[in-house]
């Protein structure tokens, strides 16, 4: 009986760890999919990393819902961007919710012919995300960009 109980406990722990690993992977993929979609001019992919009622907070601006988030990208057409994302840290809070912090360096230019000459990064900061499990899978429920360094002359 005791060995059965130990086996059940170990099985439960293993299942929980596997579930947590899947959540970490799904949330990390959202961080990367956001950057890739933005950098490759894919407004639908960009908006679809967010939940239907997702929120993006950026330098005092609030974009709520996929249509508003998609429009934000369309309004910046003609720009070439590159997001370098690192140090992705996922904290699983429940089987349906996780928090993510990632570092981001963004360069934006109006030129479209490669290679683009630039004077440096446009933004150096962090994304603070709340990810939620939805009927569509894991999505960003809320993303806030936090400036860490400002660039001067």
Language-model region placement:
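Short beta-strand segments enriched in hydrophobic/aromatic residues
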Residues: 38, 50, 104-106, 144-147
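Short beta-strand edge/turn micro-motifs at domain boundaries
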Residues: 97-99, 122-153
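Extracellular loop and loop/strand-boundary signature of outer-membrane beta-barrel proteins
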Residues: 115-116
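Transmembrane beta-barrel outer-membrane domains
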Residues: 25, 80-81, 120-122
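Sec-dependent N-terminal signal peptides
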Residues: 4-12
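Short, low-complexity N-terminal intrinsically disordered segments enriched in polar/charged residues
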Residues: 12-44, 48-52
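A solvent-exposed, acidic/Ser-Thr-rich amphipathic alpha-helical stretch
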Residues: 43-107
């Amino acid at each position: 009986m005791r060995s059965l109980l130990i086996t059940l406990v170990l099985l439960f722990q293993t299942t929980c760890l596997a579930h947590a690993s899947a959540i970490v992977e799904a949330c990390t993929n959202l961080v990367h999919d956001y950057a890739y979609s933005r950098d490759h001019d894919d407004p639908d992919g960009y908006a679809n990393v967010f939940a239907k009622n997702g929120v993006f907070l950026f330098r005092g601006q609030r974009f709520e819902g996929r249509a508003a988030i998609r429009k934000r990208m369309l309004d910046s057409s003609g720009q070439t961007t590159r997001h370098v994302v690192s140090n992705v840290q996922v904290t699983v809070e429940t089987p349906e919710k996780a928090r993510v912090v990632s570092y981001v360096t963004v360069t934006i230019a109006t030129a479209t012919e490669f290679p683009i000459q630039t004077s440096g990064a446009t933004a150096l900061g962090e994304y603070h995300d709340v990810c939620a499990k939805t009927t569509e899978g894991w999505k960003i429920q809320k993303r806030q960009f936090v400036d860490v360094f400002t660039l001067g002359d």
